[in-house]
Amino acid sequence: IHPKNFKENFYQNKKKRKILLTIDDGLLSFYENAWPILKEKKIPFILFVSTREVGSFNYMNWEQILELHESGLVEIGNHSHSHEYLVDENPKIIKNDILRSIKIFNEKLGKNSIFFSYPFGEYSLEFKKIIKELGFDYAFGQHSGVIDETKDLWELPRFPINEKYGELKRFKTLIKTLPFKYEKITPEDRYLLQSNNPPNVKIFFKDNINYLKQINCFSNEDNKWRKSNISFVEENILEIKISEKFIGERGRINCSLREKEGFWRWLGIQFVIAEK
């Protein structure tokens, strides 16, 4: 779908599967290799750029970005100014960084984008609050999953496709995934301190998900992927028991459920682990 049609596709009852293509960082290799193909095929997408990096080594410059911007195919999305680990910073530093990027967007493109992509896909409740206050309508993480009308507008999932996870076979699997519809996931803050690591995770699913009790979840607790210990504490409330702390920068949980005709429901959760 074209980014300009994202809102109507988000709220409509989607009977047909649709894809929104997003590209992070604005690397020169994308401009040289992928852009000519996407332009020829008239495939729309969002290109998220960090304003500090524009024009530096191996990154696109503003002239190239303007070319995409004026093509009618591309939305230039905001990816912060510095692309640092902002989630670990205090709110003032986060806000000033994003304000700087907005200023440059207005100077170079005549407007800021309504789309934001969190650097490294990392966010907290505080970071989300800042993004909402600064006027962004949508924000994307890097946790895997399918967008539907139950998803939080400021923590939208995406399936990463890169040099590590870019095989055509995987892509064909991804386009046969379906959403898990849910009311909420707790804890709501995806930023974990040492005091609440590991978290007590609960997913409050919407009604009428077929075969929900057959769901499987996996987590990378203790830096080792393993099948999670799960149980339904109520009919549609799943508890995921994480026995070991998440180690490193991120903790991940992926849940899946096989549907008919080779389709899968998929839901990913990403936690950011505080430095201290």
Short names for language-model regions:
Residues 1, 15-19, 27-127, 137, ...:
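Metal-dependent polysaccharide deacetylase catalytic core of the NodB/CE4 family, i.e.
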Residues 1-20, 29-63, 160-276:
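Terminal accessory/targeting
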Residues 10, 122-124, 144:
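Generic alpha-helical secondary structure signal
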Residues 136-145:
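Acidic, His- and aromatic-enriched active-site or binding-groove loops in soluble protein domains
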